[in-house]
């Protein structure tokens, strides 16, 4: 893990919140001139602390108003089965997150879709393509209370 000082952490916090901030403004906010601030950002990119910059898109503007979480429990478990599941999930653009978890089920899937009919089709396709029988439990989101990608840097 790279060593990060107070200024690095402040840079990371600011860029997570506003990735298009100019180096001049970023430098002013962290107490550096533009050149040293740019050098720090490039170092953080080289060290893969900063892994990319992304536009935050309103899913409603694209008609993707349905957000669903799905628990998937596989009937059998092995490394090859987990790899097969990974390959199938990676080819499903509606699935925006998928996590192999510990606990009473195996995968937690987050999907963003336009309508319930799309979800029904996605779930049927997913369960059909899995290498072993599986059970699923779905949770349709009624309200997104908090949706943040900001990794807290306080206390580091």
Question: Where do the protein language model's features map onto the residues?
Answer:
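A compositional/biophysical signature of low hydrophobicity enriched in polar/charged and small residues
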Residues: 1-156
């Amino acid at each position: 893990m790279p060593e990060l000082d107070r200024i690095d952490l402040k840079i990371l916090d600011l860029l997570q919140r506003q990735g298009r901030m100019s180096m001049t403004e970023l430098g002013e906010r962290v107490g550096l001139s533009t050149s040293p601030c740019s050098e720090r950002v490039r170092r953080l990119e080289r060290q893969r602390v900063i892994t990319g910059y992304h536009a935050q898109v309103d899913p409603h503007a694209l008609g993707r108003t349905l957000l669903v979480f799905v628990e998937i429990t596989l009937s059998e478990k092995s490394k090859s089965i987990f790899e097969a599941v990974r390959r199938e999930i990676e080819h499903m653009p509606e699935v925006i997150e998928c996590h192999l978890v510990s606990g009473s089920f195996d995968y937690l899937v987050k999907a963003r879709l336009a309508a319930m009919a799309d979800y029904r089709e996605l779930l049927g396709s997913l369960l059909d393509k899995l290498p072993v029988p599986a059970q699923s439990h779905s949770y349709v989101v009624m309200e997104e209370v908090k949706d943040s990608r900001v990794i807290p840097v306080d206390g580091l």
